[in-house]
Design a protein with these regions (language model features):
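C-terminal domain-boundary segment and adjacent tail
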Residues: 24-26, 110, 141-150, 189-240
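Aromatic/hydrophobic pocket-lining residues that form the small-molecule binding cavity
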Residues: 15, 98, 102, 172, ...
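Hydrophobic "anchor" residues on beta-strands that sit immediately upstream
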Residues: 5-6, 79, 217
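A short acidic, amphipathic alpha-helical/loop segment
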Residues: 17-21, 130-134, 174-175, 207
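Short beta->alpha connector loops
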Residues: 10-13, 123-127, 165-169
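Boundary/entry segment of secreted carbohydrate-active catalytic domains
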Residues: 1-14
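Metal-dependent polysaccharide deacetylase catalytic core of the NodB/CE4 family, i.e.
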Residues: 25-133, 149, 154-159, 184-194
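Glycan-processing catalytic domains of CAZymes
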Residues: 7, 82, 142-144, 153-173, ...
Length: 240
C-alpha cells in the first residue's frame, strides 16, 4: 500500500473546477487558504495583458478567488489549512505579526468550517527556525514548505515538511513509483497553474483517476502525515 496526500494553495476560484474532479474520484485533499485576501463574493478567473498588467498573474492568467460566502460549499468534505491571513511571508515581517497572521487564518477557518484546523503551508515556502518554533507552540502540527524530498517519510521536522513533488513535475509518475518503496507520496500545487487550458485539466484528471483506481493507493490528508512520519521513524520500514 502507498498513502497519497495532496494540497492546493491560495483559495483561487479555479479550485471550484478542481474539487469537482476530486469528488468524482473520491480523492482527499487539503486546501491552504488566506482568508484576508478573499472578498465576500467569488471572483471568477480572468485573463490579463501580461505586458500592461502590473499585478501578479500566471502567464497573464488570474485564478480569481473563492468568496467567503462560498467557502463551505466549495471546500466542504475536504481539509482546510492556514496559509496566513494575507499570504504573509516568514522573515519578511516581525515574527509576532507573522504568528498573528497564521492564527487569524486558523481561527477564521475553524469558525467557518466548525472543524479543527492545525495544518499550515508556508507562504512562498519561506520559514525560519523561530517561526517554526512559534507555530509548533501554537499547536500547528505541520508546516508545508516548497522543498521536495525523495523519501517523504524521512522528514525530520513536520514544521518544515517537504513534499514528493509539484503536481506539474514531468517525472510525476516516476517519483510516485519510487515513493512506493517508502509508502508515502505527497504532491501539491495551485489550480490556477492549469489556467483554462483543456489538456492540462485533462492530464490532471487522468492522474487523479489513475491514483484513485490503483488498488495499492490509499488517499490520506496532509494532517495525517506527521503521525505517519513518527510511526515510520519508530519502526523503520513499516507504515500501517
Amino acid at each position: 500500500m502507498i498513502k497519497v496526500a495532496q494540497c492546493w494553495d491560495d483559495g483561487v476560484a479555479t479550485d471550484i473546477r478542481l474539487v469537482e474532479i476530486l469528488r468524482k474520484y473520491n480523492a482527499k485533499a487539503t486546501f491552504n487558504l488566506c482568508p484576508g485576501t478573499l472578498a465576500e463574493e467569488t471572483v471568477k478567473p480572468f485573463w490579463t495583458d501580461p505586458v500592461l498588467h502590473t499585478g501578479w498573474s500566471h502567464n497573464g492568467f488570474r485564478g480569481g478567488a473563492v468568496g467567503k460566502k462560498d467557502l463551505k460549499a466549495v471546500y466542504s468534505g475536504f481539509q482546510v489549512a492556514s496559509h496566513c491571513w494575507r499570504h504573509e511571508t516568514a522573515g519578511m515581517i516581525p515574527d509576532a505579526d507573522f504568528l498573528k497572521a497564521a492564527l487569524d487564518a486558523r481561527n477564521f477557518l475553524e469558525d467557518v468550517f466548525q472543524q479543527e484546523c492545525r495544518g499550515f503551508a508556508w507562504p512562498c515556502g519561506k520559514h525560519t527556525p523561530e517561526t517554526e518554533r512559534l507555530l509548533a507552540e501554537a499547536g500547528f502540527r505541520y508546516g508545508r514548505t516548497t522543498a521536495n524530498l525523495a523519501d517523504v517519510t524521512a522528514n525530520e521536522n513536520p514544521l518544515a515538511l517537504a513534499s514528493s513533488c509539484h503536481f506539474h513535475n514531468w517525472q510525476f509518475w516516476k517519483i510516485f513509483e519510487e515513493a512506493k518503496k517508502t509508502g508515502v507520496f505527497y504532491f501539491w500545487g495551485h489550480s490556477y497553474e492549469m489556467m483554462e487550458y483543456p489538456p492540462l485539466w485533462e492530464r490532471f484528471e487522468q492522474k487523479i483517476k489513475a491514483l484513485s483506481e490503483d488498488p495499492e493507493v490509499e488517499w490520506v490528508d496532509v494532517i495525517d502525515l506527521p503521525d505517519l512520519l513518527r510511526r515510520n521513524q519508530s519502526a523503520p520500514g513499516t507504515l500501517s
